[in-house]
Amino acid sequence: MQLLLLIPLHYRLKDSKRIYQIILNLGSLLRISSIRQDNMELLELIIDPMIKAEVIERVSEFLTKTLGKIIVKCNDTSGFIANRVGYFLLELVARKAISQNLDVATIDKIFTTFLGLPSTGIFGLYDLIGYDVMKLISSSLLASLPANDAYHKIICKDPCS
């Protein structure tokens, strides 16, 4: 699944003033350079409750009718959905496959053929994203997710252990 992000964010200043913005990020944190933005069908929409409904409607209409995107409404929670779901899947499958000594090519074939992952498969995608980026995403998720989040159960702090 390829995601395009639309993220309305609000910031609280020290003097309690709020600034509300809608930021269009026509890319993805997990963006792969060979994927063009017009190929990304889904668009993640996180709405601050203080943003007026008519603003959301106008932006949504533009994104769906003009850009042809499918909007996925998400709660404002730690980690973008692409990272929360995608990274969890990559880590879980990679760790299970390695711990159970499963064939990497077979795992990649299963996920591309039956589950519609990109042709890179799990391990190819992990490699394409890069260990350094995967580690940054992991650190961010570990720091921001509650202790009872399922992510904490699949990740080990030291990738070599």
Curated annotation (Swiss-Prot):
GO terms for biological process: fatty acid metabolic process. One of its GO terms (molecular function) is oxidoreductase activity, acting on the CH-OH group of donors, NAD or NADP as acceptor. Coiled coil: none annotated. Pfam families: 3HCDH. This is Putative uncharacterized protein RC0841. It comes from Rickettsia conorii (strain ATCC VR-613 / Malish 7).
